[in-house]
Amino acid sequence: MPSPTSSSASVFSSHLFFVFCIFSQIAQSYAQFNRFFDPSIPEQETVLTDYDYNMIGHFRENDQWFVNDSAMYNPLRFEGDIANSGLNSRSINTFFGDSPLFGIFGVQRNAVRQTYLKWEQARIPYTISSQYSSYSRSKIAEAIEEYRKKTCIDFSPKSAGDLDYIHIVPDDGCYSLVGRIGGKQPVSLGDGCIQKGIIIHELMHAVGFFHEQSRADRDEYVKINWSNVEAGLQDQFDKYSLNMIDHLGTKYDYGSVMHYAPTAFSKNGKPTIEPIEKNVEIGQRAGFSENDIYKINMLYNCPTFTATTLAPENTKRVKSITKKVTSATGSPLSKKGEIGSSIGDKGDRGDNSVLSSLISIHSGLGKCEDRRKDCEFLARAGHCESRFSIRFMTENCANSCGKCIAEEKRKEVCEDARTWCERWANSGMCNQTVFKDYMRQKCAKSCNFC
């Protein structure tokens, strides 16, 4: 029979081990927490720097096709991660102007549908919370770089004149507003959200897109297992008419980064949404699919480009395709299950041409001058030449960056910023409304704009 002393020692050891386990879990959680963000740092609006972009390679990891994206499925938000005020399955018709009052004038056909408010000239001003760690900033920079390489969407640092902008902040989980709502609108990348694919997903909401499985034709492609859906959350799987969500001429995309994962809002861990097509999977968070890229460029009237699709590493999950996007009407109508990630022209979004800088200054928008008190400091730090901050510096610190030249000297630097400008000009793109602003910036010489 054990002595009272040994029994007490055993109980004490057990308690000590239990306390150790608790503190160990807390320490691990704290370490993980600080890897992504530190709430003890005062919240301030910052922008990404050259250092953040340079750290992409340092922190780069193999893109995971599927990740734990449970932070995207908040039952209190519309479709889990959409935070537009008052938006739900019952109010969405009014939200889109799809009511008898608005329908008389066909407003839903002109002002809304898939993105009811687009960002002007595809430029989305942004700020980022000071609470993010270097690792998180690099992952956000990596996602933004994907937009820069593959679309004409320009996430640019907020300037003093930008009233509407997104603020990327580590709030409660992952969420965004859809489209340009006005003012300072949050994009939350909190705990569980610092994955490139998840960041791309939330930013794509801000660009103006809803989820893929909300399409009117989704029942032809996926099956909803209602018996596995958490009670009271059935409306998170509603679908919406073409009056509200524009498919932009593309077929259903199983591989869209905007698609629900198989167990979204599951009450028992079993699939709530399953592909009808065999040998395909849904809910990937590695990055854009080809159709994601096409739809963004289609919606924002981006200039034509050639997209070469790379085969995914795991060919058992998806098939590979190669498409040439030749015009705004030539959509990649992929077959069921065919997805991929496109690589656009890497130079097409480069805003480091002298011509682009000069045009933005001499476009009649105001005097060529510094608009910030810290311009000289920023210029000395090299931000005038950085490809990541040159547009911001040109708009706000033109004088310190040496961009203020006499108007009569403008023609001396009139040039094309792209090698294919003459060919595009001969095709008539200089005078086409959807391309005119782009051609004015990149092909001023061929278009005789200077």
UniProtKB/Swiss-Prot annotation:
Zn(2+) binds at residues 201, 205, 211. The keyword DNA damage does not apply. It is an enzyme of class 3 (hydrolase). InterPro entries: Astacin-like_dom, MetalloPept_cat_dom_sf, Peptidase_M12A, Peptidase_Metallo, ShKT_dom. One of its GO terms (molecular function) is zinc ion binding. Residues 1-31 form the signal peptide. Its main location: secreted. It comes from the Eukaryota. Transmembrane segments: none annotated. Its cofactor is Zn(2+). Its EC number is 3.4.24.-. Gene3D superfamilies: 1.10.10.1940, Collagenase (Catalytic Domain). Residues 368-404, 414-450 form the ShKT domain. It is found in: Secreted. GO terms for cellular component: extracellular region. The keyword Transmembrane helix does not apply. Binds 1 zinc ion per subunit. A motif (Cell attachment site) lies at residues 349-351. Metalloprotease. This is Zinc metalloproteinase nas-13. It comes from Caenorhabditis elegans. The lineage of its organism: Eukaryota, Metazoa, Ecdysozoa, Nematoda, Chromadorea.
